[in-house]
């Protein structure tokens, strides 16, 4: 059992979506005490070829310098910061400039090859924040309360199939195309049937988490010319098991639910906001409406700005 949520401001302007998502996820804390995560879109304000790297580094002498040297082989480092974290690790965040998006994944793999270092994400149009602990602990550690954006997705995790650490927390990201993220509640029971064709196409999996499989599946469909709605509709046909998930893109969010409707999901909207979550109590954190709609079995919905 996990909690998922998404919120989109219809005017496409910057709003306090970090605070909104923090409250929405806190209302779902009972669904997942292990870890929590956010993908906040639209607020980074990076230049066209700039990316933000989010890197977990063990706190030991010389290791951060090695990470910086590896990054600088590809790009000069712009602004950067070190966020003290937990369990003898730090989070190193830095802005880089690349000639093309195709350079991003190879750079991440080079950084990941350093012992005791792992890249949590690299993005252009969204900021990813995820860690172990409660929603409010993470919110205070990374100051999600102050984050501005146009839309966001988030997750509270109750682990059932993989280890509990910062890297396995949701959202998951794919580098097949830029800035695609997924949060997920449930299990994909035909995981290997979905994964193996993607690997044969050259897509690289870093974990055995089925959420990573979903995000690569959706990104692969988008790269093949599917619309987001078409990709989600095909996923409902192809994937087995109980699931509901939310995908984040630079343009908005998409929602999909398994054909038997075995995982909860509700949505609502008013003139300003569209929101979706595992439970109604989460929606109430961002709007006051009596018109809450249940997501039907097999339903797909896309809301883009």
UniProtKB/Swiss-Prot annotation:
Q: Which domain of life is it from?
A: Archaea
Gene3D superfamilies (UniProt xref): Glutamine Phosphoribosylpyrophosphate, subunit 1, domain 1 (3.60.20.10)
Query: What EC designation does it have?
Result: 2.4.2.-
Task: Report the InterPro entries cross-referenced here.
Answer: GATase_2_dom, Ntn_hydrolases_N
Note one Pfam family from the annotation.
GATase_6
* Location of the Glutamine amidotransferase type-2 domain: 2-305
Q: Where is the active site?
A: 2
**Tell me, what is one Gene Ontology molecular-function annotation carried by this entry?**
transferase activity
Q: Which intervals of the chain form a coiled coil?
A: none
| Keywords for the protein's UniProt record, in alphabetical order | Glutamine amidotransferase, Transferase
- The name this protein carries in UniProt is Putative glutamine amidotransferase MTH_191
Provenance organism: Methanothermobacter thermautotrophicus (strain ATCC 29096 / DSM 1053 / JCM 10044 / NBRC 100330 / Delta H)
């Amino acid at each position: 059992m996990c909690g998922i949520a998404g919120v989109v401001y219809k005017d496409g302007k910057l709003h306090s979506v970090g605070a909104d998502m923090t409250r929405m996820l806190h209302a779902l804390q009972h669904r997942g005490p292990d870890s929590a995560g956010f993908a906040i879109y639209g607020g980074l304000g990076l230049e066209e070829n700039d990316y933000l790297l989010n890197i977990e580094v063990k706190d030991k002498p010389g290791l951060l310098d090695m990470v910086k040297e590896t990054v600088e082989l590809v790009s000069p480092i712009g602004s950067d910061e070190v966020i003290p974290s937990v369990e003898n690790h730090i989070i190193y965040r830095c802005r880089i400039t690349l000639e093309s998006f195709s350079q991003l994944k190879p750079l991440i793999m080079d950084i990941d090859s350093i012992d005791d270092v792992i890249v949590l994400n690299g993005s252009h149009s969204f900021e990813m924040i995820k860690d172990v602990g409660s929603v409010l602990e993470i919110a205070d550690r990374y100051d999600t309360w102050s984050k501005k954006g146009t839309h966001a997705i988030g997750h509270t995790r109750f682990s059932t199939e993989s280890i509990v650490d910062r890297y396995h927390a949701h959202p998951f990201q794919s580098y097949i195309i830029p800035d695609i993220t997924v949060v997920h509640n449930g299990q994909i029971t035909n995981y290997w049937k979905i994964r193996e064709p993607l690997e044969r196409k050259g897509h690289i999996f870093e974990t055995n988490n089925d959420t990573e499989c979903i995000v690569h599946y959706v990104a692969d469909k988008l790269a093949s010319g599917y619309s987001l709605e078409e990709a989600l509709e095909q996923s409902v046909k192809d994937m087995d098991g109980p699931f509901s998930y939310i995908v984040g893109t630079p343009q908005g969010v998409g929602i999909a639910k398994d054909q038997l409707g075995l995982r909860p999901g509700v949505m609502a909207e008013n003139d300003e906001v569209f929101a979706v979550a595992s439970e109604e109590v989460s929606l109430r954190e961002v709007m006051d409406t009596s018109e809450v709609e249940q997501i039907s079995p097999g339903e797909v919905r896309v809301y883009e700005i």
